[in-house]
């Protein structure tokens, strides 16, 4: 799943000890500035490789785990976009046959991306343009409220929540999806970066002509970490809830994603700067 919107709802706090009364910060202005920097995040993130740990658990009606699996991927950059190569499955390394299969898949993808560079560049430009419009619309469609201030990774962050404006007509699909959630976001005060989001779905979200439907109560969290004291990159993602496929199959699941071992990417002749990270 691409991490696109860590844009939901933030909280905020008042800057504390001053003898004079300080004007309340403008929550909407904080959100707009953070949203405007999202594209910088994509630009910076594709300069790093990392390890992605993913655990998926299937649940029964009572919430008990019925099946669990884990995958570890090495994420590198091919032609400006991330590529995930499986290196571990269910706690064990790949055997020679499995490793060779993964390498063939990677080689095939390198060849494919090399052929489709111009097409992928246009698709990425459109995707980023659509996201800019969606973010601008979300900033307008929500009444943002400062709720406090917290310290994340030793740094002060505004905590901001939001309530959709009654009667506001939304155009973009991403904006419509996010207004079906309730939650908050944390904005780093110094960098104006969105560094954490927490949201719960409060209305059914449908994708693909209603074939895939996320049910109310689905819970998402996402956190960032500061790497090399200069760029914010994903640290942890978690989700839990129920989804239905084609109105027939029900999936109850929990997924935990952790990101580690960030390293500055060393480009080679196959790399073309073009796309946002996963």
Model-derived features: positions:
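N-terminal secretory signal peptides that target proteins for export/translocation
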Residues: 1-2
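Bacterial N-terminal signal peptides
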Residues: 5-15
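Structured extracytoplasmic
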Residues: 19-182, 189-196, 200-218, 223-236, ...
